[in-house]
Amino acid sequence: MMTLYSGTTCPFSQRCRIVLFEKGMDFQIIDVDLFNKPEDLAVMNPYNRTPVLVERDLILYESNIINEYVDDRFPHPQLMPAAPVMRARARLFLFRFENELFSNIDAIDSGTQKQADKARLAVRDNLTQIAPVFVKQKYMLGEEFSMLDVAIAPLLWRLDFYGIQLPKQAAPLMKYAERLFSRPAFIEALTASEKVLRK
Protein backbone atom coordinates (compact mmCIF):
# COMPACT_ATOMS: atom_id res chain seq x y z
CA MET A 1 0.00 0.00 0.00
CA MET A 2 1.17 3.52 -0.78
CA THR A 3 1.78 5.88 2.12
CA LEU A 4 1.79 9.64 1.63
CA TYR A 5 3.47 11.89 4.18
CA SER A 6 1.40 15.00 3.74
CA GLY A 7 1.62 18.49 5.19
CA THR A 8 -1.86 19.47 6.35
CA THR A 9 -1.56 22.98 4.86
CA CYS A 10 1.03 22.22 2.15
CA PRO A 11 -0.27 22.99 -1.38
CA PHE A 12 2.12 20.44 -2.88
CA SER A 13 0.84 17.71 -0.55
CA GLN A 14 -2.71 18.70 -1.50
CA ARG A 15 -1.87 17.97 -5.15
CA CYS A 16 -0.88 14.42 -4.23
CA ARG A 17 -3.95 13.88 -2.07
CA ILE A 18 -6.18 14.99 -4.96
CA VAL A 19 -4.54 12.47 -7.32
CA LEU A 20 -4.82 9.61 -4.81
CA PHE A 21 -8.53 10.32 -4.28
CA GLU A 22 -9.11 10.72 -8.05
CA LYS A 23 -7.63 7.24 -8.54
CA GLY A 24 -9.90 5.74 -5.88
CA MET A 25 -7.26 3.27 -4.68
CA ASP A 26 -6.14 2.06 -1.27
CA PHE A 27 -3.59 4.33 0.36
CA GLN A 28 -2.59 5.72 3.72
CA ILE A 29 -2.04 9.39 4.55
CA ILE A 30 0.20 10.38 7.44
CA ASP A 31 -0.41 13.99 8.42
CA VAL A 32 2.78 15.95 9.04
CA ASP A 33 2.82 19.05 11.23
CA LEU A 34 5.00 21.40 9.17
CA PHE A 35 6.07 23.24 12.34
CA ASN A 36 7.07 20.04 14.14
CA LYS A 37 8.34 17.65 11.46
CA PRO A 38 9.15 14.04 12.38
CA GLU A 39 12.85 13.16 12.26
CA ASP A 40 12.35 10.45 9.64
CA LEU A 41 11.09 13.02 7.11
CA ALA A 42 14.65 14.31 6.56
CA VAL A 43 15.82 10.72 6.10
CA MET A 44 13.23 10.12 3.37
CA ASN A 45 13.58 13.54 1.72
CA PRO A 46 16.94 15.36 1.90
CA TYR A 47 15.05 18.66 1.53
CA ASN A 48 12.99 17.81 4.66
CA ARG A 49 9.72 18.79 2.96
CA THR A 50 6.38 17.25 2.22
CA PRO A 51 4.98 15.47 0.30
CA VAL A 52 6.81 12.14 0.41
CA LEU A 53 5.38 8.94 -1.08
CA VAL A 54 6.54 5.55 0.17
CA GLU A 55 5.70 2.27 -1.54
CA ARG A 56 7.70 -0.74 -0.35
CA ASP A 57 11.35 0.21 -1.01
CA LEU A 58 10.50 3.19 -3.24
CA ILE A 59 10.63 6.69 -1.74
CA LEU A 60 9.60 9.67 -3.88
CA TYR A 61 9.37 13.39 -3.18
CA GLU A 62 8.30 16.45 -5.21
CA SER A 63 4.58 16.51 -5.99
CA ASN A 64 4.75 16.36 -9.80
CA ILE A 65 7.12 13.36 -9.70
CA ILE A 66 4.90 11.58 -7.17
CA ASN A 67 1.77 12.29 -9.20
CA GLU A 68 3.24 11.07 -12.49
CA TYR A 69 4.34 7.85 -10.78
CA VAL A 70 0.85 7.30 -9.32
CA ASP A 71 -0.70 8.05 -12.72
CA ASP A 72 1.57 5.52 -14.46
CA ARG A 73 1.03 2.91 -11.76
CA PHE A 74 -2.77 3.30 -11.68
CA PRO A 75 -3.70 4.48 -15.19
CA HIS A 76 -7.45 4.91 -14.61
CA PRO A 77 -8.54 7.64 -14.80
CA GLN A 78 -5.55 8.81 -16.81
CA LEU A 79 -4.42 12.29 -15.74
CA MET A 80 -1.42 12.77 -18.03
CA PRO A 81 -2.03 12.72 -21.80
CA ALA A 82 -1.11 9.45 -23.53
CA ALA A 83 0.28 10.98 -26.73
CA PRO A 84 3.99 11.92 -26.43
CA VAL A 85 3.55 15.44 -27.86
CA MET A 86 0.64 16.28 -25.54
CA ARG A 87 2.46 14.70 -22.61
CA ALA A 88 5.52 16.86 -23.30
CA ARG A 89 3.32 19.98 -23.53
CA ALA A 90 1.66 19.07 -20.23
CA ARG A 91 5.08 18.75 -18.57
CA LEU A 92 6.06 22.14 -19.98
CA PHE A 93 2.92 23.68 -18.44
CA LEU A 94 3.73 22.02 -15.10
CA PHE A 95 7.23 23.51 -15.28
CA ARG A 96 5.78 26.94 -16.02
CA PHE A 97 3.34 26.67 -13.09
CA GLU A 98 6.27 26.04 -10.75
CA ASN A 99 8.35 28.91 -12.13
CA GLU A 100 5.67 31.54 -12.78
CA LEU A 101 3.14 30.81 -10.03
CA PHE A 102 4.30 28.59 -7.18
CA SER A 103 7.80 30.11 -7.04
CA ASN A 104 6.11 33.22 -5.59
CA ILE A 105 4.55 31.44 -2.62
CA ASP A 106 7.68 31.57 -0.43
CA ALA A 107 7.89 35.35 -0.93
CA ILE A 108 4.22 35.74 -0.01
CA ASP A 109 4.60 33.49 3.06
CA SER A 110 7.93 34.69 4.42
CA GLY A 111 9.33 37.57 2.35
CA THR A 112 9.39 41.27 3.18
CA GLN A 113 6.24 43.29 2.55
CA LYS A 114 7.74 44.56 -0.71
CA GLN A 115 8.68 41.03 -1.86
CA ALA A 116 5.24 39.68 -0.91
CA ASP A 117 3.42 42.47 -2.78
CA LYS A 118 5.57 41.91 -5.88
CA ALA A 119 4.89 38.14 -5.71
CA ARG A 120 1.12 38.70 -5.36
CA LEU A 121 1.14 40.89 -8.46
CA ALA A 122 3.11 38.26 -10.41
CA VAL A 123 0.60 35.54 -9.49
CA ARG A 124 -2.36 37.80 -10.23
CA ASP A 125 -1.00 38.78 -13.65
CA ASN A 126 -0.13 35.21 -14.64
CA LEU A 127 -3.55 33.89 -13.61
CA THR A 128 -5.30 36.73 -15.43
CA GLN A 129 -3.41 35.78 -18.62
CA ILE A 130 -4.64 32.18 -18.31
CA ALA A 131 -8.30 33.15 -17.69
CA PRO A 132 -9.49 33.48 -21.35
CA VAL A 133 -8.73 29.77 -21.92
CA PHE A 134 -11.78 28.89 -19.79
CA VAL A 135 -14.26 30.83 -21.90
CA LYS A 136 -14.09 27.97 -24.43
CA GLN A 137 -13.02 24.95 -22.43
CA LYS A 138 -13.89 23.25 -19.16
CA TYR A 139 -10.38 22.31 -18.00
CA MET A 140 -6.76 23.18 -18.78
CA LEU A 141 -6.41 20.67 -21.63
CA GLY A 142 -9.99 20.80 -22.88
CA GLU A 143 -12.97 18.80 -21.65
CA GLU A 144 -11.03 16.27 -19.55
CA PHE A 145 -9.68 16.83 -16.03
CA SER A 146 -5.88 16.40 -16.05
CA MET A 147 -2.69 16.73 -14.03
CA LEU A 148 -2.54 20.44 -14.94
CA ASP A 149 -5.82 21.01 -13.12
CA VAL A 150 -4.48 19.07 -10.13
CA ALA A 151 -1.32 21.20 -10.12
CA ILE A 152 -3.03 24.60 -10.08
CA ALA A 153 -6.04 23.79 -7.85
CA PRO A 154 -4.25 24.27 -4.47
CA LEU A 155 -3.11 27.75 -5.48
CA LEU A 156 -6.60 28.77 -6.59
CA TRP A 157 -8.00 27.48 -3.29
CA ARG A 158 -5.55 29.70 -1.36
CA LEU A 159 -6.01 33.00 -3.26
CA ASP A 160 -7.87 34.67 -0.37
CA PHE A 161 -5.38 33.32 2.16
CA TYR A 162 -2.46 34.70 0.12
CA GLY A 163 -4.19 38.07 -0.29
CA ILE A 164 -4.41 37.78 -4.09
CA GLN A 165 -7.36 39.58 -5.66
CA LEU A 166 -8.09 38.87 -9.30
CA PRO A 167 -9.57 41.49 -11.65
CA LYS A 168 -13.01 41.12 -13.27
CA GLN A 169 -11.51 39.82 -16.51
CA ALA A 170 -10.37 36.72 -14.59
CA ALA A 171 -14.02 35.68 -14.01
CA PRO A 172 -13.72 32.63 -16.36
CA LEU A 173 -10.80 31.40 -14.23
CA MET A 174 -12.86 31.69 -11.05
CA LYS A 175 -15.71 29.69 -12.64
CA TYR A 176 -13.12 27.08 -13.59
CA ALA A 177 -11.85 27.10 -9.98
CA GLU A 178 -15.37 26.39 -8.71
CA ARG A 179 -15.57 23.40 -11.07
CA LEU A 180 -12.35 22.07 -9.55
CA PHE A 181 -13.52 22.69 -5.99
CA SER A 182 -16.77 20.78 -6.60
CA ARG A 183 -15.04 17.57 -7.68
CA PRO A 184 -15.57 14.79 -5.11
CA ALA A 185 -11.83 13.96 -5.00
CA PHE A 186 -10.95 17.60 -4.33
CA ILE A 187 -13.44 17.77 -1.45
CA GLU A 188 -12.23 14.46 0.03
CA ALA A 189 -8.59 15.56 -0.22
CA LEU A 190 -9.11 18.74 1.82
CA THR A 191 -7.73 18.68 5.35
CA ALA A 192 -9.49 20.46 8.22
CA SER A 193 -6.67 23.02 8.18
CA GLU A 194 -7.18 23.69 4.45
CA LYS A 195 -10.95 24.10 4.72
CA VAL A 196 -10.48 27.28 6.78
CA LEU A 197 -8.04 28.82 4.26
CA ARG A 198 -10.92 29.82 1.99
CA LYS A 199 -13.74 32.19 2.96
Question: What function would you assign to each model-found segment?
Answer:
Residues 85, 97-189:
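GST-like fold's C-terminal all-alpha helical module
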Residues 1-131:
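GST-like domain detector, emphasizing the conserved glutathione-binding G-site
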Residues 56, 153, 192:
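Conserved residues at the C-terminal ends of beta-strands
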